[in-house]
Amino acid sequence: MQPPTRAPFFPFSLLRGRKARETCTCRSVASTEGPNTFGPRARPGCHAHQVAPSKESFHSSAFQLVSASRLSPLMSSCFVSFLRYPSFRPSAPFSAPPSSSTVPISTPSDFSHSAPASWRCVPTAPSALHAPFSFTTQAAHLSSCVFDGCSRLPCSEPGSPQTLQRALATTSATAFLRTACMSHRLRRRPDAWTSGCSGQTDNATASPCVRPLLRPPVDTASRAAANDKDAPQPTCFWRNARTSRAVHRNQTDMNFSSFSCSLRPCRHTLAKAAGHHAPLSRHSLQSLPESRIRGGTVSRGDSPGSLTLSPRNMSSDAMPVHPLYFPSAVPFSTTSGSNSSTFSCPSPSSSTSSTSSTSSTSSTSSTSSTSSTSSTSSTSSTSSPFLLSRSHSVDCRACPVSRAPPNPTSLQLLFSLFPFLWPTALKDRLRVLGSVACLVTAKVLTIQAPLLLANLVDAFQVLPHNSPLSPSGASPSSGDTSLLASSGETSSSLSPSAAPAEGAREAGKSGESAGRERRDEGSTVRLSPLAEGPASPATEERTAAGKAGTSVGGRDAGAVHALDTEHLRNTAQIVSVPLGVVCGFPVARIAATGFNELRSTLFTRVSQNASCDFSCHAFLHLHALALFHDKRAGELSVLISRGMKSVTALLNVLLFQMVPTALEFALVLYLLGSKVGGPVACITSLTMAVYVAFTAAVTARRTKIRKEMIAAEQQSVGLLVDSLANAEAVRFFTAEKGELSRFEAVQRRYAEKHVSVNQSLAFLNFGQQLIFNVGVLGSLAYTASQVAAGLLPVGHIVLVSSLLLQLAVPLNFVGTIYRETSLNLADLEKLYELMNHHPPIVNPPDARPFVLKGGAVAFENVRFAYPPSPLRPGSLPSKTGDDEKPEASRMLLDDVSFSVDAGKKVAIVGPSGVGKSTLIKLLFRMFDPASGTVRIDDQDVKELDLHSFRRQIGVVPQDMVLFNDTIEFNIKYGCPSATDEEMRAAAKQAEIDDVIMRMPQGYSTVVGERGLKLSGGERQRIGIARCLLRNPAIAVFDEATSALDSHTEQKILKAFRAMARGRTTLVIAHRLSTISDADKIIYLKEGKIAEMGTHAELLEKERGLYRALWESQQHQEQEEAVSTPDLTLS
C-alpha cells in the first residue's frame, strides 16, 4: 500500500526518542552597506528568555543594541535597535548617536535604566560577532513555533516606516537561524551563494530571507577598508538551513572550505580595521537570550566569540535542521561522529562546475562538494539520520501501517507489528533485552520448582525408620517394632517380676533376628538418588546393636544406650539434609514471580510508547482524510481506542506468550519423558492437541460473535455522541422519546451480543478444563501404577502433578492467546481499514517550498466536480486533473478564470450552490481541479509543499467552530507562540477584547463544546482575532457576516477592513453591502463567471445579475427598516 500522508511538521522519528546532534560552525562577518530589505508582512518573532539589562549596558559609547524579544506588528510601540542602511534615513522620533554608525530607534519615554526585562542588551563591539560561532542543534526537541504558520519577509521590498515596524518584529538577538527557502535558490541560481541579499537579487530568484540584525558597527576605519577595491567584500545571508554563511564577492579569495563546519577566518577582518575596540567579554555572550526550548547553558568555546546553542538555550527562531523541513534536493550532507554531526554543502565552484580548481581552496571546495554529494545520496550507517528526508515507512517505526498491504491477513497484521519489538531508541532496546532475559529466567525457575518439590519428597522417603520424623519414630506402635520390643523386654527383665532365664535366651534370639534384618536393610538399595551410597552411621550403629543383642542377649542396658545414641544422631541428620530442598522450592517460586513482574515493568514502557506512536500516526492520518461525512465521531473514537489497545495486547502476545509458551511446552515434555517415561509424555501431548483443537474451533465462533458485538457497541456510542452533540435540536423538537427509542434498540442489540459472547466463553472454559483434567487423570494413573510396582519413587507422583499443573498455565494461555489474538486482530483490522483510506491530496514527490512574493492569486480555466462517493478502504484515490474529463453537465465549476493582484480585495457573490466555497477549497488544495490551474504568486499549488503555502492563508469561515477550551487557547491557535500582549492587540482589532474582559474569567473562559457558550458574533470575532494573530499574506472570508445582526456586522466589518489592509483578500459575501469597496466583484452563476467588475461598473449594467441582486437586497432592507417600529410597538 501507499504510505499515508505525513505532515511535514510532525516528525514521528522524534517520538521514538531518537536523537542526533548536529553541529555547524559559521561566521558572521561585517556586511556591506545595502538597501534596507524588510517586507510588509513579517511574522512575529518567537519568545525568548528575558534578560534584564544592567545600567552599564545602556552606555552609548559601547555601541549597544537593544532588541525586543517578541513584538507584534499589531502593537504600536515596536522599538528595536538596528544597524543603519544607506537607503533608510530615519526621521523623528529616530535619533542616532553621533559617535556610532548604529541608528537605534528611540525607545519609549519611560524607557530608562530600569528597562523592562523584555528588552535585551547585546554589545556590538567589532569583535563581538566576528569570531566563529558554534551552533549545536539537536533535532529531538522542537519549539511550538515550528507549528505556527506565519509569513516571512520577502527580500526585495524596500523599507518604509510602515513596513519597518512589522519587519523588525521578526528579528531578535538570536536571529542567526531564520526561515527561508534555500533549496529553491540553489536550484534556480547556484551562484546565489555569492549574491546574498545585498539588494542586487532579482525578483525571480529572490527568496524570503532576513538580514542579520546583529551586525558589527561599521566605523570610519572599517568603511575605509570596505571602500578598498582590493579588499574582499563579505556578505551575510540566510537560508533555510538556518545557518549564517559568509562568502566573498571576490571569487579568487574564497576560503570557506566548501562551507564545511570549520570556516577559515577571513583575511580581512574588522578587528584589524578597528583594533582599538576591546575584545568581547564572556559576560556579553552569556547575556544572549536562552530559548523557549526549555532552559540551557552557553558553553565556552575556543575563542572569546564562541557561542554554542543547543535545544536548551536555542531560540525557537533557531529551529534545528530536520529532514521533514527540506526537500530531497537540498545539497546537504552530514558526517556523523560519536556525539555530533557536521554540515557541509557544495561550494559555488562545484555547484557551477567552474574550472577554478587551480588554487588549493577551490580544490578543497570541490573535493568537499563531491563528498557532500555522495554523502547526500548515501544511506550508510555513518550518515546522519536527520538530514535527508526519507520515506515515511523507512524512517519511522511508529507507523507500521505503512508496511501492511491493503486488506491484510491476520499473519500480515502480526508481522507488521514486529518493528515495535525492536525500537529505535537505545533505552527501549535495552528494555526489550532485559524483558527477554527476565522471561527466560522466570521460565527456568518455574520448571525448576516442581523438581525441587519432588526431591523434597524423596528426601523424606529415605529417612531412617526410627527417626523422629519417620513413621517409626513418630509412633511406637508402627514401623519397625522389633527393637522396641527388645528394649521393652529388656526393661521388664530389670523389674522385680523378672522372667526366667529361658525368657532371656528367647530375647537373645529375638535380638539376633532383629540384627540380621537390620543388616539386610542396611544393604538394600533405595528407589531414590538420595538412598544411593554406603550405609549411614545410624544404620551401622543399628547393625552393631543387633550384633550386640545376639552376643550379649540379656544385657538390656547396652541396648537402651544404643537406641538413645541413634535417635540423637538421626535428629541432627534430619535437620541438615532436607533443609536446602525445603527452602529451594519457595525461593524458586518467589524468584520466578519477581522476574515476571520485572519483565512486565520493563516492557510496559515499550508497549505504551508503541501504542502512543501508533495513535499519533492514526490521529494525523485522520486529519488528512475527507472521511468524516460518513462516520460519526463516536464510532471513530471507539475504533481508534480499541485499535490502540489491540496494539499493546498483540505486542505482549508476540513477545511474552507465543514463544515462551512453546518453550515451556518443550521443557515440560522433555522432563516428563526423561524422568517419568514416554507414555506420560504421549498422554500430555495428546491432551495438548485436543485442547488446542477445541479452543480453535470454539474461538472461531466466538470471534464472529465478538465482531457483531463490537459493531453494535460502535453504533451505540456513535448514536450517543451524535445525540448529545445535537442536544439543543432534540429539545427544540421535543424528540427525547424518539432518541430514547433509537438508543434503546441499539443498546438491546448490543446486550444480546454481549450475552452470546459470555455464553460462548463459559462453554469454552468448561471444555478446556474438562479436557485438561482428563489428561491429568491419565498421567497420574500411569505414574501411580509405576510407583506401586516399585519402579518409580513416590516423589515422581508429586513431580508429574506439579508439572501438569504448571503446564495448565500455558495451556490456558494457549486458549487465551488464540482467543485474544483473534479478537485483537479483529479490532486492529477495523483500524487498518480506516488507515488504508488514502488521502485525496498528498504532497508531490518533488514538492517545492512556496516562495512568497506578495500573495497574488490566479485561477486559470478551472473545472471541478466533487467525487460521487467517498473512497473505499484500500482503494486508490480517483484520478483528478487533466487525465479525467468529467462531463460538463456534472461540473460544479466550469472554465472559471480570474486573478487577484497582491494586496487587492476581490469579492465573489452568487446564488447558493454555485461553487463559491469550493474556490476556497481549491485554493487550499483540499481538492485538485479536474482541469486548469490554481496559482499563488505564479506558482502552481500542485507543485508546492502543502504546508508551505497553506501557512500563508488565513480563513474566517461562515460557521466558526471553536475548541472546547479557553478563549486564549482558541485565539492563540493561529500562532501558538504569541504573547499575551499580541493576543490582546489582535482581540482589540477584532472588537472582542471589551466583551472578553467583561467575562468573570476573562481570556480563561471556557467556550464550551463547539463554542456554544458564545454568541455567533462573538465566535466570528474570535475567529477574526485568530486570523489577525496568524498574520497571513492572503485573507479569506467565507460569508462570515451572513447570519449576524446589522450592529454586530458593522463591528465585524470594521475588523475585516483592519485585517485586509495590506493583504490579498478574497471575500465570499451574501450581503452585497459588505463588499461594495472591493477592487473586483465576480458574480458566479451555474459554475461560470457571469459578470465581473467593480461595484460601480456592475451597477451600470441595466439588466445585470449583480444589479438585480443589489436592488433586491436594498428593497428588503428598506422593508425591514419600515416594519421594525411596528414590531417593537406590538
UniProtKB/Swiss-Prot annotation:
PROSITE patterns in the record: ABC_TM1F (PS50929), ABC_TRANSPORTER_1 (PS00211), ABC_TRANSPORTER_2 (PS50893)
Localization in the cell: Mitochondrion membrane
Transit peptide interval: 1-65
Deleted gene: phenotype: Conditional knockdown results in reduced formation of plaques. Subtle but significant growth defects in parasites. Reduced number of parasites per vacuole. Partial conversion into bradyzoites. Altered levels of iron-sulfur cluster proteins. Global decrease in cytosolic translation. No significant effects on mitochondrial morphology and function.
Residues reported to bind ATP: G910, P911, S912, G913, V914, G915, K916, S917
ABC transmembrane type-1 domain ranges (all copies): 587-823
GO BP, sorted A to Z: intracellular iron ion homeostasis
Residue ranges of the TM segments: 406-426, 574-594, 653-673, 678-698, 761-781, 791-811
Pfam assignment, any one: ABC_tran
Location of the region described as Disordered in the Swiss-Prot/TrEMBL record: 191-212, 276-315, 341-385, 468-554
Domain ABC transporter as annotated: residue spans: 857-1111
Enzyme class, broadest EC rank: translocase
Protein family membership: Belongs to the ABC transporter superfamily. ABCB family. Heavy Metal importer (TC 3.A.1.210) subfamily.
PANTHER family to which the protein is assigned, alphabetical: ATP-BINDING CASSETTE SUB-FAMILY B, IRON-SULFUR CLUSTERS TRANSPORTER ABCB7, MITOCHONDRIAL
Descriptive protein name: ABC transporter ATM1
Organism: Toxoplasma gondii (strain ATCC 50611 / Me49)
